[in-house]
């Protein structure tokens, strides 16, 4: 079984669409998705600055578009045809994962990511909040310190890698007095994602999600909530919406990949973060970070 992974916000890089736009039909596809997202994704994915694509309202649809453009090309080449796959996406990457697993159409996925990004950006503007990575330290001590500061472990990505989220004043205190043997690194995001600070985004996102045609997953699809498979369209969409204010348990997704004895891991663009975690947590399992069309041909040997 091969794991297909869709990255989340923070993975975006300047020019990440450039190599993909050389493919037949890619420019037309991005033009259609640009219309759906009400953004010029071609420009944003080729010539826009790092600062511009860091904007939550821009980054989320751009990342989903990059992932799905690569997945469409992979499907066109039939590289993994006939092979069993298990699909997971990190945070906004879940939307792309839903499209890969057949729950929603790719066009709807990009439009939904645009709504999600816009609604979350508005929520971020209501109060100064943020996120910081806590690297290392004893997990129990780290979680205890976060609780003391009224911070939330918004992302639990892997052993020794927890992302704290909450008010900026509390994050500053965490950086000044971190848990023993832990380092704290502020993340360049606009707010405390996957916490109750995102509650103002729920109504708008839920309304957009409710208007999308859905189908039951055609592949094993994991939830960020608990790392377990979601088996119906209704459950999948409920989970997707509620995930805005709930922690991302990528560590549990990784545990499920281990239980399913995956034989290879493919991370779609903008790739690097999730395949890096997989190499550390699932030692011995080949992990490929797809960054350009040339990387797709190498997947034939998986």
UniProtKB/Swiss-Prot annotation:
Coiled coil: none
A GO term from the CC aspect: cytosol
The reaction(s) this protein catalyses: holo-[ACP] + malonyl-CoA = malonyl-[ACP] + CoA
First-level EC class: transferase
Statement: the UniProt record of this protein carries the keyword Oxidoreductase: no
Keywords: Acyltransferase, Fatty acid biosynthesis, Fatty acid metabolism, Isopeptide bond, Lipid biosynthesis, Lipid metabolism, Transferase, Ubl conjugation
PTM section of the record: Pupylated at Lys-173 by the prokaryotic ubiquitin-like protein Pup, which leads to its degradation by the proteasome.
Covalent cross-link (Isoglutamyl lysine isopeptide (Lys-Gln) (interchain with Q-Cter in protein Pup)), residues: 173
Other information: Was identified as a natural substrate of the M.tuberculosis proteasome. Was identified as a high-confidence drug target.
Protein name per its UniProtKB record: Malonyl CoA-acyl carrier protein transacylase
Source taxonomy: Bacteria, Bacillati, Actinomycetota, Actinomycetes, Mycobacteriales
């Amino acid at each position: 079984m091969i794991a297909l992974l869709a990255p989340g916000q923070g993975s975006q890089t300047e020019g990440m669409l450039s190599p993909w736009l050389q493919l037949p039909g890619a420019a037309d596809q991005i033009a259609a998705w640009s219309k759906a997202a009400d953004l010029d994704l071609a420009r944003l994915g080729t010539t826009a600055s790092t600062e511009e694509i860091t904007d939550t309202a821009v980054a989320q649809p751009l990342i989903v578009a990059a992932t799905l453009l690569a997945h469409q090309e992979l499907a066109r080449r039939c590289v993994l045809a006939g092979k069993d796959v298990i699909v997971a996406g990190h945070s906004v990457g879940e939307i792309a994962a839903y499209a890969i697993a057949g729950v929603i159409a790719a066009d709807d996925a990009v439009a939904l990511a645009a709504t999600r990004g816009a609604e979350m950006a508005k929520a971020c503007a209501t109060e100064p909040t943020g996120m910081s990575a806590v690297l290392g330290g004893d997990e129990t001590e780290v979680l205890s310190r976060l609780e003391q500061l009224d911070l939330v472990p918004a992302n639990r990505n892997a052993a020794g890698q927890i992302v704290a989220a909450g008010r900026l004043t509390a994050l500053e205190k965490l950086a000044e007095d971190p848990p023993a043997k832990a380092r704290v690194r502020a993340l360049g995001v606009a707010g405390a994602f996957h916490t109750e600070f995102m509650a103002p985004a729920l109504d708008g996102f839920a309304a957009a999600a409710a208007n999308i045609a859905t189908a039951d997953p055609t592949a094993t699809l994991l939830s960020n909530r608990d790392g377990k498979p979601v088996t119906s369209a209704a459950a999948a969409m409920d989970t997707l919406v509620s995930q805005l204010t709930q922690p991302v348990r990528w560590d549990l997704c990784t545990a499920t990949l281990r239980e399913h004895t995956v034989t290879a891991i493919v991370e779609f663009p903008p790739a690097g973060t999730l395949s890096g975690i997989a190499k550390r947590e699932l030692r011995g399992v080949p992990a490929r970070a797809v960054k350009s069309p040339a990387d797709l041909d190498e997947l034939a040997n998986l």
